[in-house]
Curated annotation (Swiss-Prot):
PANTHER family: AMINOPEPTIDASE, XAA-PRO AMINOPEPTIDASE P-RELATED. Pfam families: Peptidase_M24 (PF00557). Mn(2+) 2 binds at D305, D316, E428. This is Uncharacterized peptidase C18A7.01. Its cofactor is Mn(2+). Coiled coil: none annotated. Its EC number is 3.4.-.-. Mn(2+) 1 binds at D316, H384, E414, E428. It comes from Schizosaccharomyces pombe (strain 972 / ATCC 24843). Belongs to the peptidase M24B family. Binds 2 manganese ions per subunit. It comes from the Eukaryota. Transmembrane segments: none annotated.
Amino acid sequence: MVSFESSFERGTDFLNRNFKKCLFACISIFIFALLALSFLSLLQPDTVQRLYQCAVPSMIYVPPMINEAISIQHEEFNNRRRRLSAALREDKLDALIMEPTVSMDYFANITTGSWGLSERPFLGIIFSDDEPYPGDVASRIYFLVPKFELPRAKELVGKNIDAKYITWDEDENPYQVLYDRLGPLKLMIDGTVRNFIAQGLQYAGFTTFGVSPRVASLREIKSPAEVDIMSRVNIATVAAIRSVQPCIKPGITEKELAEVINMLFVYGGLPVQESPIVLFGERAAMPHGGPSNRRLKKSEFVLMDVGTTLFGYHSDCTRTVLPHGQKMTERMEKLWNLVYDAQTAGIQMLSHLSNTSCAEVDLAARKVIKDAGYGEYFIHRLGHGLGLEEHEQTYLNPANKGTPVQKGNVFTVEPGIYIPDEIGIRIEDAVLASDVPILLTNFRAKSPYEP
């Protein structure tokens, strides 16, 4: 007869053996399930990838358009330096001095991207076309450069400019070296020159002046080559917005949508934007708010203010859209149409070139919104100049009464209504002032469903 104790022990051994097997089987199944889910997640794209895959087919025409763009050519840079030299003569100054920022980009095709700013000054000097500096000013440009950087500077400047180089050793004062070489000149200091450099030039003995309106205005009138570049990059920008709009669904976050727009720029052969403005619902009442993890709700406006660059020239475009299948309230539709009508009024003013001031353009658009009772919610200027800088002279604001609109100016026209904690709407296009204003975005928005 088997004792109770031995039966219990055999039963316990059986349970222990089978428990271990069951536990091992459960763990194996759990691990397999995790691996299967991970594999399925790889097969199923995340929100950003799904949105990108939905939008990118509509961008197919953008890469060829960008690839066919032609950069600013050598002769245009020569003409720019000639115009600068003539302006310096008019201002009775000897030269403009600049760092590798936007002005050196404009006059010599050298940018911060190709020569980063540091504590060691690398300066470009373009002279007046007056005596005692005779000859073709188009090629007469000096560069102050650290001696050990001279080969790099020559490679960067290239052979198209007959430049002169003034070098300084590490144990020398670069500003004194420049003064000893050039003498007591009257220098116009470019507005982007850093303060310690401006002070160094003054202490060395140069007489310095700020940038005159005459010189500052040289970049305001865009050449046909500039207009072509800016048109291409603005068309590409609005193409990204139009491509993604039908794909937007409630539940996406502002950051996810901003990431997709940058992915579309890269697909088009363009650089990403560091700070895109993508805002949903009431958050769009902050004109320059940044994207957050806020998720899109049903029947909310989506404001996208985005841009990129081509050969250094900026685009800037804003659309306030509604995802397909979502419905507007009467108030949303009324406010969107009001902003659209204000933009229409502003654009139309850019054809009145004889005696229209920048202030009048702003006030024409502002009047539309004010007359409808929403003037207090249009809280910024109508627009700004656009070019090698995203915001550059001149500005469409009510105080700019003394600056006329000129043929060849490129402005953004971007009225908006911003009601705190409720709604924000802005529509923006880049426009070339002309007898018939030219949209550099090619098409205006037609509705929140057709950006």
